[in-house]
A protein has these predicted regions:
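Short acidic, hydrophobic short linear motifs in intrinsically disordered regions
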Residues: 8-20
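Short, amphipathic alpha-helical interaction segments positioned at domain boundaries
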Residues: 62-83
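Short, hydrophobic-biased segments on the C-terminal half of alpha helices
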Residues: 32-36, 53
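Positively charged, polyanion-binding regions of nucleic-acid-associated proteins
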Residues: 1-7
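C-terminal regulatory/effector modules of DNA-binding transcriptional regulators
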Residues: 137-216
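Mid-protein regulatory/catalytic core that forms ligand/cofactor-binding pockets
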Residues: 88-169
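Short, Lys/Arg-rich nucleic-acid/phosphate-binding segment
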Residues: 48-54
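Glycine-centered, phosphate/nucleic-acid-interacting loop/turn motifs that mediate DNA/RNA or nucleotide
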Residues: 42
Length: 216
């Protein structure tokens, strides 16, 4: 929904949703459970058209999807960062805490030793900021994207499913990574290469829309 129906209030039918989820091996019962949970959490709302249920994002769902969109679809960016070494007994500055007395900050901190971050962080620091399961997921996704064959001959259904799968997996990774320039994380998680692969494939699949889905 956040990829195909973020900018409008169009519904997606339960038939279409079941076709999409079946293509990736999700059973109808699991789809129903997921839809129920998303409705309960105020992400989705439903309506009956004839005998069939249709779903769309709620106002909350659209708002949160739009807020997350720059991180999911946008480029990385460069901005100055400092490693602030401060008194562990004092209040921590606003930033990304690595250890007691050590924090990544967006501006120099008074009373701290501020070291401009010109190089990637060592892997042990990246490990403090990004969980191992996220780093493993990023590596795994990048490897799989590199092995994708030509996608020009895919059917409309396959193109929709491929795009949604890429967005889903990338979203689960990038939203659990600190919002810092990709190069800061260095080899600890090869985010720059993965982002380039994701953006390339999403550009190739940029023609995918609800119009294609409705025609399935």
């Amino acid at each position: 929904f956040g990829d195909l129906a973020r900018e409008d209030d169009r519904y997606i039918s339960s038939r279409t949703l079941n076709r999409l989820t079946a293509e990736i091996g999700v059973k109808p019962e699991a789809t129903r459970v997921a839809l129920h949970r998303l409705r309960k959490e105020d992400w989705l709302e439903s309506a009956k058209f004839g005998r069939e249920s249709h779903y769309r994002l709620t106002n909350k769902g659209r708002k949160l999807s739009r807020e997350a969109a720059p991180r999911i679809y946008g480029d990385t960016f460069d901005r100055p960062l400092w490693m602030a070494l401060y008194d562990p007994g004092s209040a921590a500055p606003d930033g990304l805490r690595i250890l007691s007395g050590m924090c990544l900050v967006a501006q120099e901190q008074k009373g701290a030793m501020n070291v401009a971050l010109d190089h990637p962080l060592p892997q042990w620091m990246v490990g403090r900021l990004v969980d191992q399961d996220v780093r493993s997921a990023a590596k795994n996704l990048h490897q799989r994207l590199q092995t994708l064959a030509q996608i020009s001959d895919l059917s409309n259904l396959e193109r929709v499913v491929l795009r949604l799968s890429i967005v889903h997996e990338w979203r689960r990774i990038i939203l659990r990574v600190p919002d810092v320039p990709d190069h800061v994380l260095g080899d600890g998680i090869a985010l720059r290469d993965l982002r380039q692969s994701v953006q390339h494939l999403l550009a190739v699949l940029s023609d995918v829309s609800l119009d294609h889905v409705d025609d399935i």
